[in-house]
Amino acid sequence: MMKTVLLLVVLVGVAYCDDDGWDMGNFFQQYHQWQQQISSSSSSSSSSGGGGSSGGGASGGGGGGGSSGGGGASGGGGGGSSGGGGLTKVVLKAGGGGRGGGGIVKSVGGGGGGVTKLVAAGGASGGGSVSGGGGGGLALLAGGSAAGGGRSGVVTVSKQPIIINRQVTHVNTGGSGGGVGGGFGGGRGGFGYGLYGGHHHYNPCGYGQVYSYYYGCQSIYKQPARQVYHQPIYQPVQTVYQPVQYYQQPYQYQHSYGQASHAYQPQTTKYISYSYPQYSSQGSYPIVAGGSAGGFASARSGGFGLSSGGIGGHSSYPLSVFKHAKGEKYKL
C-alpha cells in the first residue's frame, strides 16, 4: 500500500511541478482525488491523529478538538515525514478551543527532497503556531489565523509578495536545506519568515529599507532590534500670507491725483511638519530560522533557534508595522 502511495505521490509531483511555476487549480483538483483515495485506504495505518481525527499516517491529520489546544503538541501527521521525492502535501488541522484556538502544531518536515506543502486551518484567536520547511527543496508558506480570530487562508506558491495581516512576505521558490518556514497567527497579529539560501527574503524593499503600509518603502538606519526608528517624513511647506498692507503711491506730476495701489507683501511664516513613523513592538518581529520546526516549538536544524513558548531568536529590522505619530509643526 505504501509503495502505491509513494508512486502516486511521485506521479503527481512530476505532473504538476515544473521550473517556471505551478498550476494550482489542477493541483488542488488532483489533490482532492488523491486525498480521497488515501483516506479510504490508510485509515487503519496508524492511531488517531491527535484529538479525534483518525486517518493519520500518510493522510495527515493531527487535529481534532480538545480542551488543551486541539492539536496539542503532537500535531503533524503522516506523509511529510516520509519525504522521499516528488510531491507531498500535508494538511495540518488545529482543533478549536483551549489555548490560542489551536494549541501548538508542530511542522512536518519534507525529508529528502521534492515538494512539501503545508496547509494550516487554524482556529480562532491565533490558530496556534504552524511552521514548515524541513530539508525539502521547496516548502510552501502556511498561514495561521488572523489576530481577530477566524479561519486562516491557504497560502499558495507565488513569486510576488503576499500580504498577511497587512504585512508583506515572500514565498521562497528555492533554497537548500531550509526551504521556507511557515507563517504564524499569533495573538497579536501574524507574521511570516523564510530563508533563501540563508538570507532574508521577506522584505520586498531591499536592504536598508523597510516597508510601511502607509508610506511604502522607507529607508532606515541599521540599529539593534526593538528600537524606535525616527525617520522624518517631510511634508510640503505651507506658506502663510500676512494681511496685505495698503499705501499711497503719488504720481510724479503735481496736478495729478493720487491713486491707491495694493502691494502684496509676502511676509511669510513657513511651517514644516515632521511625522515620525514608529516601529510597533506588538506582533511584528521578523524571525530568521532555518529549521524544520519553529514558532513556539524549537528549531531543529540550522539557522537560529526560536525560544520555546515565545518570540525569540534572531530579530532583524522591522518588517511593516508602523505607528505614525501626529505631525507637529515647528515654526522656522
Swiss-Prot record:
What start and end residues bound the annotated signal peptide?
Answer: 1-17
Q: Where is this region: Disordered?
A: 39-81
Q: Which organism's genome codes for this protein?
A: Margaritifera margaritifera (Freshwater pearl mussel)
| One Gene Ontology cellular component annotation held by this UniProt entry | extracellular region
> Where does the record place Gly residues bias?
48-81
List UniProt keywords, sorted A-Z.
Secreted, Signal
Asked whether the UniProt record includes Signal among its keywords, one would answer: yes
Q: Which domain of life is it from?
A: Eukaryota
This protein is called what?
Serine, glycine, tyrosine and glutamine-rich protein
Location(s) in or outside the cell: Secreted
Cysteine disulfide partners in this protein:
none
Tissues expressing the protein: Prismatic layer of shell (at protein level). Expressed primarily in the mantle with highest level in the mantle edge and lower level in the mantle pallium.
